[in-house]
């Protein structure tokens, strides 16, 4: 976004807030027939116990402590994602929360915020060094394509379709006094697994079992935060 990173010496007490992991979106590809309208089928699943937000917050804290070793870094819970999005807290390179939230941050001595929010962008999914996909993706989830034949990298076995875990989110570093967004990065990360990885090799959704699905999203979150947070300092 062309914003200035924050010098390490400027960040005294950093609060980390994640509001991008409370739901999972499953996007099923539907071949387009000339229409410019997104034809994909989308299903959202709400997650309890903060979903992936707790994991994302902890991963961001670990990276922030490396980036700003002299700062006190702690996780915060400000408000539900829907409230932050509906209230337009973050727009036009400004952070404008309700007065009560701002007063709470100032009373707690928070000088800066690291805010993780969902990001919507075109579906560009990594597959063998190429980008594939249609429509748009947002937040955390899985893209399911049951049409494109994809081989397993390890065995060469051919499967009909693939499953792509994705993490589309934004990380913003905010100066609480004045509400300035000092740095911001939008992230569109993904991985892919051939349908041939499933036990029957028929449905790409089965390419990863439930534990592997969770681990795949966690890897994307952790690796992207490790990549971008160090860039937010000079």
Identify what each model region corresponds to:
Residues 1-25, 124, 129-234:
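C-terminal/domain-edge helix-coil "capping" segments
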Residues 30-149, 153, 166-170, 174-184:
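N-terminal segment of the mature soluble domain
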């Amino acid at each position: 976004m062309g914003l200035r990173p924050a010098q390490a010496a400027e960040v005294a007490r950093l609060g980390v807030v994640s509001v991008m992991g409370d739901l999972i979106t499953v996007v099923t590809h539907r071949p387009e027939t000339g229409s410019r309208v997104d034809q994909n089928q989308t299903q959202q699943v709400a997650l309890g116990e903060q979903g992936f937000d707790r994991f994302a917050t902890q991963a961001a804290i670990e990276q922030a402590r490396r980036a700003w070793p002299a700062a006190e870094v702690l996780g915060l819970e400000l408000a539900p994602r829907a409230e932050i999005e509906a209230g337009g807290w973050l727009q036009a390179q400004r952070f404008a929360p309700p007065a009560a939230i701002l007063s709470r941050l100032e009373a707690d001595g928070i000088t800066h915020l690291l805010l993780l929010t969902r990001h919507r962008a075109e579906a560009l999914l990594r597959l063998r060094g190429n980008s594939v996909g249609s429509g748009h993706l947002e937040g955390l989830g899985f893209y399911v394509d049951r049409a494109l034949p994809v081989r397993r990298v390890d065995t060469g076995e051919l499967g009909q379709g693939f499953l792509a875990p994705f993490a589309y989110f934004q990380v913003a570093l905010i100066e609480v006094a004045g509400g300035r967004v000092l740095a911001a990065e939008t992230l569109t990360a993904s991985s892919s697994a051939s349908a041939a990885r499933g036990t029957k090799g028929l449905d790409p959704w089965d390419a990863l079992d439930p534990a592997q699905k969770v681990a795949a999203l966690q890897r994307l979150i952790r690796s992207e935060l490790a990549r971008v947070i160090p860039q937010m300092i000079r």
